[in-house]
Swiss-Prot record:
One of its GO terms (cellular component) is cytosol. CDD domains: YajQ_like. Keywords: Nucleotide-binding. The keyword Nucleotide-binding applies. NCBIfam families: PRK05412.1 (NF003819). InterPro entries: DUF520 (IPR007551), UPF0234-like_C (IPR035571), UPF0234_N (IPR035570), YajQ-like_sf (IPR036183). This is Nucleotide-binding protein Bpet3698. It comes from Bordetella petrii (strain ATCC BAA-461 / DSM 12804 / CCUG 43448). It holds the Pfam family DUF520. Nucleotide-binding protein.
Length: 160
C-alpha cells in the first residue's frame, strides 16, 4: 500500500548558515556600524540583540532575506514581542519544527472533506497518508499544497 509522510522541518545546517550570513551583513551595513547588534542561534531559537526596537525590525528583515536565500520558508518563523530595557532590546525568533496537533487535524479534515480514498494518521509531529493508488496520494499532495496552512510542508518517505 503506497504511503508518504507530511512533515514540517528545517535543516539545522542551513539555518546556522543563514544566521552566520545575517551576522556578516550586519557587520557591513552602515546603519549598524558601531552598534552591538547581533544574531545568536541556540537550537532552533534565534535571538536578536540590538540597541533599539527599531533596529530589531530591520534585523528581522535581514534574517528573513537570508533564510529565504538559503531555501528556508519564512512561514516557519514565530516572532516574539521585543523586550526593551536601558541596555538595549532583544527579540526571540523561534523556528517551528513539526506539525502541531491542531494543524494536523485541520489537514486531516481537508483530506476527508475531499472524499479521497486514503487513510491519514498522526504520528507525533508527522502526518502519514496511505492509500491504494499512487494517483490518490498525488491528489492529496496537490490538495495539501492548496490548503492554507501557515507552516511550510514537505512530503517525504514516499513508498510504493
Amino acid at each position: 500500500m503506497p504511503s508518504f509522510d507530511v512533515v514540517s522541518e528545517v535543516d539545522k545546517h542551513e539555518l546556522s548558515n543563514a544566521v552566520d550570513q545575517a551576522n556578516r551583513e550586519l557587520a557591513t551595513r552602515f546603519d549598524f556600524k558601531g552598534t552591538d547588534a547581533k544574531f545568536e542561534l541556540e537550537g532552533f531559537v534565534v535571538t536578536q540583540v540590538a540597541p533599539s526596537a527599531f533596529q530589531l525590525k530591520q534585523m528581522l528583515d535581514i534574517l528573513r532575506g537570508r533564510l529565504s536565500a538559503r531555501g528556508i520558508d519564512v512561514r516557519c518563523l514565530e516572532v516574539a514581542d521585543p523586550l526593551e530595557n536601558l541596555g538595549g532590546a532583544r527579540q526571540k525568533v523561534t523556528v517551528r519544527q513539526g506539525i502541531e496537533q491542531p494543524v494536523a487535524k485541520k489537514l486531516i479534515a481537508a483530506i476527508k472533506g475531499a472524499k479521497l480514498k486514503v487513510e491519514s494518521q498522526i504520528n507525533g509531529d508527522k502526518l502519514r497518508i496511505s492509500g491504494k493508488k499512487r494517483d490518490d496520494l498525488q491528489e492529496v499532495i496537490a490538495l495539501l499544497r492548496k490548503t492554507d496552512v501557515d507552516l511550510p510542508l514537505q512530503y517525504q518517505n514516499f513508498r510504493d
